Design a protein with these regions (language model features):
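Generic structural signal for residues positioned in beta-strands
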Residues: 1, 48, 92, 103, ...
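Reverse-transcribing Pol proteins
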Residues: 1-82
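Hydrophobic (often cysteine-bearing) scaffold residues that line and stabilize catalytic clefts
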Residues: 12-16, 86, 152-155
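Short, well-ordered loop/turn elements at secondary-structure boundaries
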Residues: 25, 44-47, 56-61, 97-100, ...
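Contiguous, well-ordered alpha-helical segments that form the cores/surfaces of helical PPI scaffolds
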Residues: 47-51, 114, 144
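Conserved pre-motif C helix in the palm subdomain of viral-like polymerases
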Residues: 60-64, 68-71, 98-103, 109-112, ...
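Active-site-proximal segment of RNA-dependent polymerases
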Residues: 73-106, 110, 114-117, 123
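Active-site-adjacent bridging/hinge elements
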Residues: 126-139
């Protein structure tokens, strides 16, 4: 489905390639060499990916990794522990805002892409991709946490 869509729309194809190239340049993903692929590893998972277009941001293409996609009855998120709930309660946050005369808040851009995944755990975050139909399929691996996977002490 993704292949057909990208082959039929060259502009969309270029934007999708650019999104993956950006992740490669930022160090969020790495292309795996052949010798690393040939090593036996029982913990390997390949994530499907697809594109999402936001009607409110017409020039932006986002590629989404699907940690909830099933394969032979299971999916990656089934295997991850969500860990303890570390979020502060909204009531507590609002009460603390009222305690002082100045309040501050911040938003960290793409926070999941800032958290490194332990090297031995990265094999469950692989995906396949080829830039053009003429090229061979390459295997890539995330080295940073992906949005959509359960937060886990494993990462």
């Amino acid at each position: 489905l993704l292949k057909k869509r990208l082959e039929s729309d060259q502009e969309l194809n270029a934007k999708y390639r650019q999104a993956i190239d950006d992740d490669l340049q930022k160090g969020n993903i790495k292309k795996l060499p052949e010798q690393e692929l040939s090593q036996a590893n029982p913990r390997v998972w390949y994530l499907p990916h697809h594109l999402v277009l936001n009607p409110h941001k017409p020039g932006k293409v986002r590629y989404v990794r699907d940690a909830a996609a099933r394969y032979q009855g299971t999916f990656l998120n089934d295997q991850l522990s969500s860990g303890p709930d570390l979020l502060n309660s909204l009531v507590g946050i609002l009460m603390r805002f009222r305690q002082e005369s100045i309040a501050m808040s911040a938003d960290i851009e793409a926070i999941f892409n800032k958290v490194a995944v332990a090297k031995e755990k990265q094999t469950v975050l692989r995906f396949v991709w080829r830039r053009t139909p003429e090229e061979k399929v390459d295997v890539y691996q995330y080295v940073r946490h992906i949005f959509g996977a359960k937060c886990s002490p494993m990462f």
